[in-house]
């Protein structure tokens, strides 16, 4: 039973089994041909023999309504099929013989979504929390860094975005570690520099190094990987700390180079290499303790956006939970420990946890002997020693915390440098031992 199909273009002639073996069934649904076409049948075929049954395909005046399709139509949902079983079209490519592969992009053999995109969308996780690998990220810190980095990769109308973000604050407050957590959260592998690289015996070497690292990060961005330039302790390498530091030519060139990059972030050239091609813009994140020691034009608002990091009580508790996360310390004990030391930096609690292991190390040394420590730790066939995790109670933590605080007080109180200049005696060095009763033991 052949039927002639007439369309605007050339349409292949095909055999259409309109009835099968029974009677009364209509031709194939117009949904088979797409949503924008409809079928006009001149007459209904009453029996299995079709003499000259012809139908015409013309453009539809309106979209096909699902209510017009009958339940008996086996192809009624084919035009709207976006089910996952169509993934089999692409999964078989390259895995089975081409004889058994369905033709691509022909008829119904059209993958609604590729397998890679389907799996990626199915496995994607949207993490908007401020926890990374069990470590706490302060919400204000996360917000500042993510917004600054995102702005530098956007094209905002008539907006000059500062290239440099300066994170500064007290010592030991976790500025660098919080930055690294944010980078890990965003999937960024930063190009890192330290203050020690901002000085050299050769004039101009640090400035050239900054440009090299910047262009290295720019090349990574061109390859489709988000990257930033991260400089630790900028004020220690480029700042002036009173009369104890000497301002060198390299300090001047480092400041001038950062100012120039902030003004022209897409035109950073190396000495002797000048090309007209613009490089990708790279956000710069710097940390420091006191930005007032830096060159004032460098830290002006158009070049550097400044963020003073002063963790709140909630931030300190959150970070300490991450520090003691594997030790089984109750949350109420962590809160009490933090509240009893409000003036201490966050790094204090990390040093406190490390101090608790002193007893375990002391036991191990007494077991192997002092003379065998080197053989057991360096290139030992037995491997490094392992310890059972010590139980950390609040009383033990408070005891070691008081010891750390006492050492801090000794440094501030016993200033031997001033004593050496003023008198020949040792000052408070022996006086402490005499008062404590340990001098004559």
Curated annotation (Swiss-Prot):
Binding site for ATP: 167-174
Domain of life: Eukaryota
One MF annotation (Gene Ontology) recorded for this entry: ribulose-1,5-bisphosphate carboxylase/oxygenase activator activity
GO terms for cellular component: chloroplast stroma; thylakoid
Compartment list: Plastid, Chloroplast stroma
Keywords: ATP-binding, Chloroplast, Nucleotide-binding, Plastid, Transit peptide
Function: Activation of RuBisCO (ribulose-1,5-bisphosphate carboxylase/oxygenase; EC 4.1.1.39) involves the ATP-dependent carboxylation of the epsilon-amino group of lysine leading to a carbamate structure.
Family: Belongs to the RuBisCO activase family.
Name of the molecule in the record: Ribulose bisphosphate carboxylase/oxygenase activase, chloroplastic
Organism the protein comes from: Phaseolus vulgaris (Kidney bean)
């Amino acid at each position: 039973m052949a039927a002639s199909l007439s369309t605007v273009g050339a349409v292949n002639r095909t055999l259409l089994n309109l009835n099968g073996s029974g009677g009364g069934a209509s031709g194939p649904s117009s949904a088979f041909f797409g949503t924008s076409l409809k079928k006009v049948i001149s007459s209904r075929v009453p029996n299995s023999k079709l003499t000259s049954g012809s139908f015409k395909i013309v453009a539809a005046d309106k979209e096909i309504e699902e209510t017009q399709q009958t339940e008996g139509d086996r192809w009624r949902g084919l035009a709207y099929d976006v089910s996952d079983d169509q993934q089999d079209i692409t999964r078989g490519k390259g895995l089975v013989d081409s004889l058994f592969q369905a033709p691509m992009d022909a008829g119904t053999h059209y993958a609604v979504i590729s397998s890679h995109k389907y799996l990626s969308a199915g496995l994607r996780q949207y993490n908007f929390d401020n926890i990374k690998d069990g470590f706490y990220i302060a919400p204000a810190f996360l917000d500042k860094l993510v917004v600054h980095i995102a702005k530098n990769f956007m094209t905002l109308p008539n907006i000059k975005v500062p290239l440099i973000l300066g994170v500064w604050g007290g010592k030991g407050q976790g500025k660098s570690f919080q930055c690294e957590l944010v980078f890990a959260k965003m999937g960024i592998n930063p190009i890192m520099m330290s203050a020690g690289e901002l000085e050299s015996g050769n004039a101009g070497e640090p400035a050239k190094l900054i440009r090299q690292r910047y262009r290295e990060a720019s090349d990574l961005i061109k390859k489709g990987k988000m990257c930033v330039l991260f400089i630790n302790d900028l004020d220690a390498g480029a700042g002036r700390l009173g009369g104890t530091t000497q301002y060198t030519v390299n300090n001047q060139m480092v400041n001038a180079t950062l100012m120039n990059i902030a003004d022209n972030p897409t035109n950073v050239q190396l000495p002797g290499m000048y090309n007209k091609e613009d490089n990708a813009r790279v956000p710069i994140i710097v940390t420091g303790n006191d930005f007032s020691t830096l060159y004032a034009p460098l830290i002006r608002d158009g070049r550097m956006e400044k963020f003073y990091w002063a963790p709140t009580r909630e931030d300190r508790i959150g970070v300490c939970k991450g520090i003691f996360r594997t030790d089984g310390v109750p949350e109420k004990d962590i809160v009490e420990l933090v509240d009893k030391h409000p003036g201490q930096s966050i790094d204090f609690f990390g040093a406190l946890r490390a101090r608790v292991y002193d007893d375990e190390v002391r036991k191990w040394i007494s077991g192997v002997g002092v003379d065998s420590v080197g053989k057991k730790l360096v290139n030992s066939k037995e491997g490094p020693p392992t310890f059972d995790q010590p139980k950390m109670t609040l009383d033990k933590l408070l005891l070691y915390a008081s010891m750390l605080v006492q050492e801090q007080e000794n440094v501030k109180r016993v200033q031997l440098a001033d004593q050496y200049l003023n008198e020949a005696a040792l000052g408070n060095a022996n006086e402490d031992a005499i008062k404590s009763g340990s001098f004559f033991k």
